[in-house]
Regions:
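Elongated, amphipathic alpha-helical interaction scaffolds
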Residues: 1-300
């Protein structure tokens, strides 16, 4: 039985909601909410940038989805959905934002022509899990914003590149969502299991996003693409899990091997030390006996 709403974290559905002219108002509302922009700085219009070398229905690298747009002030936004935590993920996010910044200049343009770039990334995992122990780092909230600032005084003078992360796993599902950010987290996490449009998502941007994800409106081609994307994510998740298990097994084997070698070394070391101690004890005893024999010979 098909669900009422498709998973918005899936490549095809994410771009259907946030990367089309038809639902551009959803993208604008999403950016305004996550960037927590005041009325005077709110985004009122965006222009979707063309995807770079991406086929109509992407069937590779499903865990990475992005949408690029620019607002009326020229600020560029790289909106990305990341399903799986892969090695080098943070570096790739920084690289993509930096690339969007540096690729703005054409021949004849100068540095003042550069516009700010903001990377907005939704993660379906704990990118910064809460640390353990007495030296643990401060907890990073569900919605975090990062930019360059002066190290000692904290002055924020360099805002050309900014990074925003929404970690869905940090959403507290034990209570109804209160803020707009919490409602977006709720939307991303719960949409595939919803049977009706809940009251907390009855406002326009969320309702429109759910309508875009309504499975009954999918064509057969779109449904097939959605199913293939979901299967590809599961395959990728399984491959990562298998790689981790194999690495763990290899680590255990290597650890046992190193442990045995270390044990041999330690055993030899302890044996030598014990031999020295035993030799000293035997030498002392032999010396005492020899001294007594010499004393007796002197008396006789």
């Amino acid at each position: 039985m098909r669900p009422l709403f498709a998973d918005p974290k899936t490549d095809f559905v994410f771009k259907k909601i946030f990367g089309t002219e038809e639902h551009k108002s959803v993208l604008i509302a999403f950016l305004n909410h996550l960037l927590e922009l005041g009325e005077e700085h709110r985004i009122v219009e965006v222009h979707l940038l063309p995807p770079e070398q991406r086929p109509k229905v992407q069937e590779l690298k499903y865990s990475i989805v992005d949408v690029k747009c620019v607002d009326a002030r020229g600020t560029i936004y790289v909106v990305e959905m990341q399903v799986l935590n892969v090695e080098g993920f943070e570096k790739r996010v920084v690289y993509n934002v930096a690339k969007a910044y540096t690729s703005q200049l054409d021949v004849g343009q100068t540095y003042p022509d550069l516009n700010d770039v903001i990377g907005v990334t939704i993660c379906d995992f704990d990118l910064w899990p809460e640390g353990e122990g007495p030296q643990k780092e401060p907890a990073v909230p569900m919605l975090s914003r990062w930019r360059m600032q002066e190290q000692h005084g904290g002055a924020r003078g360099l805002g050309q590149l900014q990074l925003v992360f929404l970690e869905l796993r940090k959403y507290d599902a034990s209570r109804p969502p209160q803020t707009m950010v919490e409602k977006w987290a709720y939307f991303f996490r719960e949409a595939p299991s919803l049977k009706v449009v809940p009251e907390v998502l009855a406002e326009r941007p969320f309702k429109e996003a759910l309508e875009a994800a309504r499975v009954a409106l999918f064509t057969d081609e779109e449904w097939d693409a959605y199913i293939r994307a979901g299967m590809a994510i599961q395959d990728e998740r399984g491959a990562l899990s298998l790689a981790r298990k194999e690495a763990l097994r290899e680590g255990r084997k290597e650890g046992r091997k190193e442990g045995i070698e270390e044990g041999k070394k330690e055993g030899r070391k302890e044996g030598i030390e014990e031999g020295k101690k035993e030799g000293r004890r035997e030498g002392i005893e032999e010396g005492k006996k020899e001294g007594m024999r010499a004393a007796i010979r002197g008396i006789l």
